[in-house]
Amino acid sequence: SSVSQAGLVNNLNDGMAWGLFPLFFVAARMNLEQVGTLAAIYPATWGVMQLFTGAWSDRVGRKWLIAAGMWVQAAGIGVVVLADGFAGFATGGALLGVGTAMVYPTLLAAIGDVAHPSWRASSVGVYRLWRDLGYAVGALLAGVTADAFGLPAAMWVVAALTFVSGLVVALRMTETLRRAPETAVEGA
């Protein structure tokens, strides 16, 4: 359940970012080229960094990489809300991308760690249901909150949920990476 809720909240960020970030950047008087560049920073950072973070999770474990990644995502959203120009928005987007890269491949690895091959596809399907539901939940939650309270409030709500999701992982999830027992060195 810790992995599924983290997947939902991770994609909730996407639903918010895709819908609200461009509006937020336009409201901050960014031109179309700047908005396009800023919109690309988050997924580009995420895409490149996950090439490394997936392998990193094979060495350091899953739990704390997921929890820390959720917190980095929350910080990235907060930086975007607090920023007043292109450099700050870009920094927040990059942080959101790094945090997402820490979480995205690691969540799937955690499922693979615990699911027996005979039911792995079913467990991945259940996880993907919850994860992908996050897109819709994020778009709806962010949109309704933005309409009622404004763009910054909606973004803070998503940042807070993301931070709490990291806490849920930190407090409830058990480490799923099983390490091979150390082998004795011959002659030692």
Protein language model regions, located:
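Structural signature of the two symmetry-related core transmembrane helices
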Residues: W64-V79, A159
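Residue-level signature of mid-helix packing/kink "hotspots" within the transmembrane helices
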Residues: P43-L51, Y135-A136
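Paired small-residue
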Residues: G76, A87-L95
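Short amphipathic helix-loop junctions that connect adjacent transmembrane helices
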Residues: G19-Q34
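Helix-to-loop junctions at the C-terminal end of transmembrane segments
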Residues: M49-G61, A146-D147
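A membrane-interface helix-boundary motif in multi-pass transporters
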Residues: V144-T162
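Intracellular juxtamembrane helix-capping segments at the cytosolic ends
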Residues: M102-A115
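Pair of pore-lining "gating" transmembrane helices in MFS-fold secondary transporters
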Residues: S1-M16, A94
